[in-house]
From Swiss-Prot:
Gene: dxr
Catalytic activity: 2-C-methyl-D-erythritol 4-phosphate + NADP(+) = 1-deoxy-D-xylulose 5-phosphate + NADPH + H(+)
EC number(s) on file: 1.1.1.267
Keyword entries, A-Z: Isoprene biosynthesis, Manganese, Metal-binding, NADP, Oxidoreductase
InterPro entries (UniProt xref): DXP_reductoisomerase, DXP_reductoisomerase_C, DXP_reductoisomerase_N, DXPR_C, DXPR_C_sf, NAD(P)-bd_dom_sf
Family matches, as NCBIfam families: Dxr, PRK05447.1-1, PRK12464.1
Name under which the protein is recorded: 1-deoxy-D-xylulose 5-phosphate reductoisomerase
Upper taxonomic lineage: Bacteria, Pseudomonadati, Pseudomonadota, Gammaproteobacteria, Pseudomonadales
Length: 396
């Protein structure tokens, strides 16, 4: 019998990371945790290390590393502690690693995810920002290295499952007419537009269907999450933005659909639980038990669909415009959104101001080519500086 696959989980203490470890723990004969990373939740990372006994753990700073080393020693756990971006890149590209779960949220996940790609790993991509920021460079690295890129976002994983195996030949060549990206509409789908001025971070983070971290919950509430997913879908499936349509589907049971030229529409259904796409990607091309309950169609009884309201969700419009503009526009969009969401969570701006701030930054920052990773981070930094300048003028 072959040895278990060694998995690095980047972002182990987050929602995706914990779900990944849940699936791994269900199949100890197939998978083992090789390395786990965490950001601010050092105590939670300690507990995960004690339970899963990885070879390495990665934290952001020397201070956090010293604290974790002392705690691991006291617990009798031999996990080696690394720190910073260099540590993340090391465990993402290590020769012993078979697959990498890339689940660090935001721009911070780009370099370690790219390190895994360049090392030719099987990369389970939950960090959509990596593709949004550096799509052309990222996909070229995938082609050059021979890495296997498998999407973890439930929507992109659904599309992947509904696509023919040779979709890389081009959507037209395999008879795909369009991709239908489903969205729940979030907690404010029916909130009067004028009432959005007064919604709180707690309300924005109370998603009706999914359990997620705070940043992605706010992105879901603003539908920026769907906008970022639209951009990601364009890169993953080599689709023009016009070929990707967003459909609001409140039940979050159909995770996305692929429309073919012969009139067939293939959909992937399942309970809203991230362990399904995680298990699908971990085992691909095989199937394993994820721990998710079977879908009860009789309990669901109905499936509803509606067009997205761009007056209520201007972030979706901004993301589509950025996708169409290409070059640096998606990286600028992403950076401005990260700053805006953080400001909203800190109660420095109101919910509708997230889109207002992003739009102003997009208007101010010219669209330029991004020929290198340095150029990507330069565009990201300029957008963050413009965003902070906007906050100084307009924030509370």
């Amino acid at each position: 019998m072959s040895r278990p696959q060694r998995i690095t989980v980047l972002g182990a203490t987050g929602s995706i990371g914990l779900s990944t470890l849940d699936v791994i723990a269900r199949h100890p004969d197939r998978y083992q945790a090789f390395a786990l990373s965490g950001y601010s939740r050092v105590d939670e990372l300690l507990a995960l290390c004690v339970r899963h006994r990885p070879a390495f753990a990665v934290v952001p700073s020397a201070e956090a590393a010293a604290r974790l080393r002392a705690s691991l020693a006291a617990a009798g756990c031999a996990t080696e502690v690394l720190e910073g971006e260099a540590g993340l890149c090391q465990v993402a590209s290590a020769a012993e690693v078979d697959a990498v779960m890339a689940a660090i949220v935001g721009a911070a996940g780009l370099r370690p995810t790219l390190a895994a790609v360049e090392a030719g790993k099987k990369v389970l991509l939950a960090n959509k920002e990596a593709l949004v920021m550096s799509g052309a460079l990222f996909m070229e690295a995938v082609r050059r290295s021979g890495a296997v890129l498998l999407p973890i976002d439930s929507e992109h994983n659904a599309i992947f499952q509904c696509m023919p195996g040779d979709y890389a030949r081009g959507l037209s060549a395999v008879g795909v007419r369009r991709i239908l990206l489903t969205a729940s509409g979030g907690p404010f789908r029916e909130t009067p537009v004028e009432a959005l001025l007064d919604v709180t971070p707690e309300q924005a983070c109370a998603h009706p269907n999914w359990s997620m971290g705070r940043k992605i919950s706010v992105d879901s509430a603003s539908m920026m999450n769907k906008g970022l997913e639209l951009i990601e879908a364009c890169w993953l499936f080599d689709a023009a933005p016009a070929k990707v349509e967003v459909v609001v589907h409140p039940q979050s049971v159909i995770h996305s659909l692929v429309d073919y030229v012969d009139g067939s529409v293939l959909a992937q259904l399942g309970n809203p639980d991230m362990r399904t796409p995680i298990a699908n990607a971990l085992a691909w091309p095989e199937r394993i038990d994820s721990g998710v309950a079977p879908l009860d169609l009789f309990a669901i009884a109905r499936l509803d669909f509606q067009a997205p309201d761009e007056q209520r969700f201007p972030c979706l419009r901004l993301a589509r415009q950025a996708a169409e503009a290409g070059n640096s526009a998606p990286a600028v969009l992403n950076a401005a959104n990260e700053v805006a969401v953080e400001a909203f969570l800190e109660r420095r701006i109101r919910f509708p101001e997230i889109a207002g701030m992003i739009e102003q930054v997009l208007d101010q920052e010219p669209v330029v080519p991004l020929p290198s990773l340095d150029a990507v981070f330069a565009a990201d930094q300029r957008a963050r500086e413009l965003s902070r300048e906007w906050l100084r003028r307009h924030g509370r």
